[in-house]
Amino acid sequence: MYESLQQMQEICETENKAFWELVMEEEANEKQNSYEEVFEMMRSMYRAMVQADENYDDRRSASQMTGGAGELMAKWNRDEKTLSGPFLGQVMERALKMAESNACMKRIVAAPTAGSCGVLPAVMITYQKLEKCPEDEIVKALFVAAGIGQIIASRASIAGAQGGCQAEIGSASAMTAGALVFLRGGSLQQIYEATALALKGLLGLVCDPVAGLVEVPCVKRNVIGAVNAVSCSDMAMAEITSFIPVDQVIDAMDEIGRNMPCQYKETSQGGLAVTPAGKSVVL
């Protein structure tokens, strides 16, 4: 287990390895599998994401709070009404669809959590489809995301109950930003800059699920995490940097999470959950 992204960068430079290779090798050693087996396991994760996207339907959740937003966004995209263009339009659509599928208890891939399951797939699937990216490159990008997520989990948290929504949507957005920079041919330093920028932008985000369900505001926050990742990848590719190094940003998230009142950490005792509309939900 590596202790920091800085440590991983130093190893990559010393051993002349790509970041994704380092992550894959660690996973193979831990599971006692071959590199090929681990690579194919990750491919199966990506294909499960694609299948979840393709199997979306616009049914509403059991609570009736969510459902159908993904199809509404799809129609908006088909009508070419979005100001954000085809890429971001499809990213938003897929993020909604994946998160709504989770709310309806359908099969998804936690990335890193079920509540943030729409962020990484939305960007990866859209990139593959619109940029005609080979599947193998997407799989490598998922290893990049996994390596970033591993460090966030070890230095801070990826659980809303421990660190608030910054730990879920924030982590997913950071992982996705780094993975996208990799796909776009950015350097490891640019991957780290995108990761830091994405996480910084979502620091302090609380976890305040209405009625204790992973629906409101969780579904639509997946869109925010995905769009944030894309914008931060653009900034990093433009050579814009984070004044605070990535490992220190992760540590800041941990500090914020530790000091965040418990009513903002998945207890449904604060924020949107205790608004009149939030308290009106009867299950």
Q: Language-model features: where?
A:
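Conserved phosphate/anionic-ligand binding catalytic regions in large, soluble enzymes, centered on
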Residues: 105-123, 167-172
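Alpha-helix capping and helix-loop boundary segments enriched in small/acidic/polar residues
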Residues: 82, 111-114, 136, 160-168, ...
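Alpha-helical support elements that line or immediately flank enzyme active sites
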Residues: 121-132, 180-185
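Functionally critical mobile loop/hinge segments
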Residues: 182-283
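Glycine- and small hydrophobic-enriched segments that form the cores of compact globular domains
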Residues: 83, 110-117, 127-129, 133-134, ...
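A structural-propensity feature for long, helix-poor, extended segments
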Residues: 143-175, 179, 202-228
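Acidic-glycine-rich active-site phosphate/pyrophosphate-binding loop
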Residues: 85-102, 137-156, 201-209, 244
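Generic N-terminal targeting/processing segments that precede catalytic cores or assembly contacts
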Residues: 1-106, 130, 239, 246-283
